A protein has these predicted regions:
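Extended, subdomain-level signal for the structured scaffold at the beginning of enzyme domains
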Residues: 1-95, 107-111
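Short, thiol/selenol-centered motifs that function as redox-active sites or metal-ligating centers
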Residues: 102-103
C-alpha cells in the first residue's frame, strides 16, 4: 500500500490539511499526520487543534512514498523553519519521490532549490 506523510506545524491551514488526508484515505492511501512540534496536538490557523498520528522524530520516512505540506500562515513559515523536514524534502526530491504542497506551502520548495 502507498504511504504518505503530511506535516503539521503550528498555524497550518486546517481545511487544506484535512481535505488531503480525507481524500487520500478514501483512495486507500495510508497517510499519517506528522507533527513537527514537540507535541502531538497541533493548533491550526483557525484555532482548531488536531492530534497528529506521530511526532516527526518517530515518523518512518523510509516507508513513505510522498511528503505533503499543507499551507497556512504561520504554518508555512513554521514548516520552512523546521530543518529536519527541509532535509527530508531535499532527499525525497533527489530520489525522485513525490513531494507536494498546497496553497502557500510551495514557497518552502522554492527556498530549498
Amino acid at each position: 500500500m502507498a504511504k504518505a506523510l503530511i506535516f503539521l506545524a503550528t498555524g497550518y491551514e486546517e481545511v487544506e490539511m484535512l481535505t488531503v488526508v480525507d481524500m487520500l484515505r478514501r483512495a486507500g492511501i495510508d497517510i499519517d499526520m506528522v507533527s513537527v512540534t514537540k507535541d502531538p496536538e497541533v493548533t491550526g490557523s483557525h484555532n482548531i487543534t488536531i492530534k497528529a498520528d506521530v511526532l516527526f522524530e518517530d515518523a518512518d520516512l523510509d516507508q513513505a512514498q510522498a511528503l505533503i505540506l499543507p499551507g497556512g500562515i504561520p504554518g508555512t513559515p513554521n514548516l520552512k523553519a523546521y530543518t529536519p523536514l527541509c532535509e527530508a524534502l531535499k532527499t525525497f526530491a533527489k530520489e525522485g519521490k513525490l513531494v507536494a504542497a498546497v496553497c502557500a506551502a510551495p514557497t518552502v520548495f522554492s527556498e530549498l532549490g
